[in-house]
């Protein structure tokens, strides 16, 4: 979603005119899919425990039909209209519609699907030509508030002002071309260029078992044909237990990366970069130091993590296959880091300089601080230590001030420098300065950029970012680096 400007909320009088109900009749939705896929229900016969864990998870419920039961369990009625420009919007949960009232009357848009649910529910309505469009109001699960979908997506890039949101009718908010691939399973877009229509279809809403394990029909047949008490040598299914760390990470990154697809099909176990082009710091949705500003998901920061670079860490060590965090209990908070950082975990107070058992003594408080964008929480998966010096330079967030909100970045910078005489912030500041210069087309720093690319200590994300931006310099010295 691309921010274009800041919304001016002007109230308009609601006219008591007849309600027009907006429909779209094209064939977009659930369809039977063959090609060896049998559906998640077929897994339940032998894997009831995992089926229950999956079906109640945010993976299994990544998208679901809007129902009265969902509304009763997860949503609270909207008490006041939301004004967006000259229009007013309200969700009528009992009727399953969002009404739009304005100078030309009132329209009602059917709520057909609910998207998400961990932090936010977005809602989809049928639009002409087979499109599913994100409705203009969404629901904050934790705050129990309704809010303006598009206004929440404004980036507020440093040094800019006057931003305004994209209209909710914009193609940026069309499900068929945006968020479809990670909220339903076995999807085909079925776009007809000549008629500009979609017949987008999927096997199941949510992320199903076969998304990670591949088609299961052959597996089901093999298991049913096996003699009682025996297991076939060839299970005819993808066994993620046999994956390397890189294969695990690649399989998760398909949905947890900001990227551009290069091929139409990814099979779990494939190499990520054979199928996708990862967005790096050429995108202003990142601060120059690599911290998140806008919507970036996880994988770019993950590739910057020293823990990941060591080669053994993968997503399923901290998260279950259904997406749950394994260390949510307070007593287990630091166990995620225990296998590799035993000495520090066992004496966390000395390492963190925070009282044992306090929020600041958790590893993730400093190394994976949580920020939010568009009301969606995300933890920093770079796992880098706090760098308040980059906050001073580039306004990026730092873990110290996310907790110590009564202090400023200068205080945090002085504190970490007093605690750590070795200036670990210097390399981060140096490479962030190169990204900042490249973004500003300040090619006086080109020699330093080339030196960084030649360094054995370079970070692949920062190096890739520079390589992508340097051609704008037009300088022939960049040729060897490219």
Q: Residue ranges of each PLM-predicted region?
A:
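Signal peptide processing junction and immediate N-terminal pro/mature segment
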Residues: 19-27
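Positively charged n-region of N-terminal signal peptides that target proteins for export
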Residues: 1-5
């Amino acid at each position: 979603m691309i921010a274009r400007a800041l919304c001016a909320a002007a109230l308009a009088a609601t006219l008591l005119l007849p309600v027009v109900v907006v429909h779209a009749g094209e064939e977009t939705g659930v369809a039977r899919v063959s090609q060896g896929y049998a559906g998640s229900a077929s897994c339940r016969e032998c894997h009831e425990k995992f089926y229950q864990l999956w079906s109640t998870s945010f993976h299994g419920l990544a998208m679901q039909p809007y129902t009265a039961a969902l509304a009763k369990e997860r949503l609270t009625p909207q008490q006041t209209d939301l004004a967006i420009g000259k229009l007013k919007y309200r969700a009528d949960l009992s009727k399953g519609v969002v009404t739009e009232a304005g100078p030309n009357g009132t329209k009602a848009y059917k709520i057909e699907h609910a998207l998400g649910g961990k932090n936010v529910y977005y809602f989809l309505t049928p639009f002409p030509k087979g499109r599913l469009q994100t409705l203009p109001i969404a629901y904050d699960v934790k705050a129990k508030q309704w809010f303006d979908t598009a206004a929440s997506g404004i980036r507020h890039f440093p040094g800019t002002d006057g931003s305004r949101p994209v209209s909710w009718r914009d193609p940026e908010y069309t499900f068929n071309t945006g968020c479809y691939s990670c909220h339903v399973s076995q999807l085909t877009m079925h776009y007809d260029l000549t008629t500009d229509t979609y017949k987008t279809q999927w096997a199941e809403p949510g992320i199903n078992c076969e998304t990670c394990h591949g088609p299961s029909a052959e597996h089901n047949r093999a298991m049913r044909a096996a003699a009682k008490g025996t297991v076939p040598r060839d299970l005819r299914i993808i066994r993620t237990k046999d994956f390397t760390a890189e294969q695990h990470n690649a399989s998760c990154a398909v949905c947890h990366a900001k990227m551009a697809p290069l091929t139409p099909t990814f099979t779990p176990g494939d190499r990520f970069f054979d199928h996708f082009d990862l967005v790096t710091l050429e995108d202003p949705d990142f601060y120059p130091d690599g911290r998140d500003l806008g919507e970036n998901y996880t994988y770019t920061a993950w590739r910057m993590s020293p823990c990941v670079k060591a080669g053994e860490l993968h997503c399923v060590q901290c998260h279950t296959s259904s997406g749950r965090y394994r260390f949510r209990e307070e007593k287990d908070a630091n166990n995620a880091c225990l296998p590799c950082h035993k000495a520090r975990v066992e004496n966390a107070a000395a390492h963190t300089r925070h009282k044992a058992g306090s929020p600041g003594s958790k590893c993730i408080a400093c190394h994976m601080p949580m920020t939010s964008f568009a009301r969606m929480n995300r933890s920093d998966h770079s796992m880098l230590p706090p760098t308040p010096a980059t906050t001073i330079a580039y306004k990026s967030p730092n873990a110290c001030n996310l907790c110590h909100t009564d202090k400023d970045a200068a205080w945090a910078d002085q504190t970490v420098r007093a605690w750590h005489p070795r200036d670990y912030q210097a390399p981060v500041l140096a490479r962030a300065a190169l990204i900042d210069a490249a973004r500003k087309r300040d090619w006086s720093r080109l020699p330093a950029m080339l030196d960084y690319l030649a360094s054995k200590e370079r970070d692949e994300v920062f190096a890739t970012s520079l390589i992508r931006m340097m051609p704008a310099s037009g300088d022939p010295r960049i040729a060897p680096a490219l």
